[in-house]
Amino acid sequence: MSLKIGIDVGSTTVKVVVLDEQDNLLFRSYERHLSMVREKTCELLRRAEPILKGQRVKAVITGSAGLGLAKSAKVDFVQEVFATAEAVERFIPDTDAVIELGGEDAKIIFFQGSLEERMNGSCAGGTGAFIDQMATLVGVTADELDELSLGYEKIYPIASRCGVFAKSDIQPILNQGARKEDVAASIFQAVVDQTVAGLAQGRDITGKVVFLGGPLHFLKGLRQRFQETLQLDNDHAIFPENGDCFAAIGAALCSQGYGEYEYEDVYQRLVDSVEDRGGTQTMPPLFASQEEYDEFLTRHNSKKPPEVDADTYTGKAYLGIDAGSTTTKLCLIAPDGGLLYTYYSSNRGNPVSVILEQLHAIYDKFGDRITIAGSAVTGYGEDLIKSAFQVDAGLVETVAHFRAASHFSPGVDFIIDIGGQDMKCFKIRNNAVDSIMLNEACSSGCGSFIETFAKALGYSIADFSKMGLLAKHPVNLGSRCTVFMNSSVKQAQKDGATVEDISAGLSISIVKNAVYKVIRAASADDLGQNIVVQGGTFLNDAVLRAFELELGRNVTRPVIAGLMGAFGAALTARDLGLEQSNILTAEQLKDFTHKSNPTTCKGCTNHCSLTINLFDGGRRFISGNRCSKPLGGKKTEMPDMFHYKYKKLRAMEGKGSGDGSRGRMGIPFGLNMYENLPFWYTLFTKLNFEVVLSPESSRGIYLKGQHTIPSDTVCYPAKLLHGHVEALVEAGVDAIWYPCMSYNNDEGIGDNHYNCPVVAYYPELLAANVPALKKTKFLDPYVGLWRHKDCAKRLSELFYTEFGIPKKETKAAVEAAYDAYNAYVEDIHKTGEQYIEEARAQGKPIIVMAGRPYHIDPEINHGINDLITSFGFVLITEDTLAYREGYETRTVLNQWTFQSRMYNAARYVCTQKDMQMVQLVSFGCGTDAITTDELRSILESGGKLYTQLKIDDITNLGAVKIRIRSLMAAMDARKEAK
């Protein structure tokens, strides 16, 4: 008789099971391995020794981190999908699909027909590690997050494809006072959405669904979100008793056909494998000796504020608060800038309570000895904190940091600030912030990146950072995304790298990311001669040293590098010149109360998720809004081309000049329909069709089509199309018109006039992936509007075949459609001209929003246009200016119409004093990878500022607000310099 051992080595846990010959479970164990994979496996086997000692056994290893161990120990290996399928078919034979979430992997296995599996690729969004990261962010354990989620009232949209993006969604929501219960449930919902959209890739998850893996085994809230989203009752949602160990059980079952050994022999082979390591690339050490490190410390410790004795000081004091995305910082200074009190800590998901606690501490410590004569706040939570505590002034982060940097280094020309999850770089010209770079899509070069690794390896961030300073062989981990880096670290550990080497390697990676991915520097001279580094991440000496080595020059790091935002705010508070601050006194703080309620604004189609913060004395602060409507203020109607174009296009439905006798023609309102709708609307109404547009885009429209999206990497505007066509089918239209169009009209401004591949051919993808389209006539022919004669011929033949329409009638309708399109373009040019004249008559600055025609969709731009006009800008679009400049050769292949327009508009902006350009970029846009650098180059060489706003299904505009205000601050500074 032999026993069967199944070992599942996952990315974060090891599972060991022992089965008898009848497949009864004799032993099971599930534990985190903290990257000590081989040691933990041996430890768990030792625990099973009472059962295994002296027995003949068959052993099989499975799991994402198991192959290396199996090879070293010469134990049989089975791929985890087969192991899981084996266990499911043995114990739950009528299963239709399995959803399994692990530490860093997620998979769906479909059992209908042949076995088909889908696994996550390079991204660990939506897995156990993602949930752990999010729990840390909220300041609770994963179990507490689960407990919280069960008491939710409202779900916020959160991106889960990437821990970084989720952080940038969650942090502002927390900072604006949202309930942790709602945030917890929203995190789980994000995991569900990621699994359904990212993994199912358009295939329906129906029938009997088995849920496996640790997260689904332990987290009730996650299970609830899956059941609700997939609409599964208790008979169809199966959560097996040993769901966390199913792959290990499957591995044990698979051992049937493998060799039999003495248990002691198998165990010894596993023990021996602990010492078996491979080879990892290494780099030179950060410091060659302790002396070199001491000299480095002496140099950097010289930059500090004046000394002041806080215990005896009496007089005026100035308070600066930096309510950052993950941390809260305070500085109380004397008039000469000497530090009286500082605070730097995580905001624990509730910045209001942290600052309340700190104000009490300040009043307790200083009592009547000081008078707070001024206060200022900066950072993500600026508006909330200003409102909560009646702070005197608020200022944008970029200005606060520059203010502090120039205090320590008056001639500073470049500032780099690396915080928890954001990285800001400012070029200083003429004593003002001139251009700003922020990390767009990824925080792999930021502080929370190292912190996450430190915690995963069981160290505090302080200890972990110190370990790398004198490491002899820093590991070369590349400069990639957090998730990829995870696998690099794991590989390095398997190859025997020490924690010291990994710590040093991570510091070097952070710097490479900052210099080459965010700043995109070709050389150190691109940055500047007088560089100041700040932000908590630079308090890490290893990161600072790596930065100096990478640039080949010394930089300035003030001793208070982590407090620079708060210090800059305190200096600003001092410069207000007040006698007494308005900030709540110790007496007023006794009555301080704060309650927050989530709600949805019904003021317009944006349906902003609002958080109403209520304070004592009837004060309230509303966050999440993109205009002043919910605040009771009247919306200032600044000229706005986004609104104008959108309203004009949405009106293009109905029977028009025809009678609608040929039926209802559905047109999905998305992508290039924002460019060509005037043509199609006129064509179909002239042919007596009634034009039915799909409803306005919304989160609901996205969710309606989410299950048919085959790739999670496509841009959000394309994803929305799935919901638009589903809605048209539901509306019962007679046909849906959505042609494939390789080309746009030739405007003579580029080397060619293509649509991007997604815009051009998305109709074919919809036809292949949206089953509902089989219920209607879906017309997606190839059409080229730019060749008038060919187009008329093509359409007249097509409509004769499909609808029996005489060719002559179609040709006449095509002529009318061209006239209508040309009239629309002419109207856009004229209106743009009119808006520019209005702006100049009123002395208002003009922002040119450069993007795609479909970026005017409020669901895609999330009301960014409202936000911009609320700051007093007149907003026009790139197509109102592009025709004013002729063709010019570019350094890149200029073959996409919409990009050509942006280049031309940027050239025109460079000739106008009162214009600045802001580029909208959809996350996942391939062609914009080229456009952004080219646009930056045109604008900066023309003396303009370059501002880019990345948009996606993420709706929180906190980061956008910072950018726009930074742009305004830079514009003001340039004016003053002149």
What are these regions (language model features)?
Residues 4-46, 116-117, 121, 321-361, ...:
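Short glycine-rich, Thr/Ser-proximal phosphate-binding strand/loop in the N-terminal lobe
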Residues 128-133, 239-276, 403, 447-452, ...:
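Glycine-rich phosphate-binding/hydrolytic loop that grips phosphoryl groups
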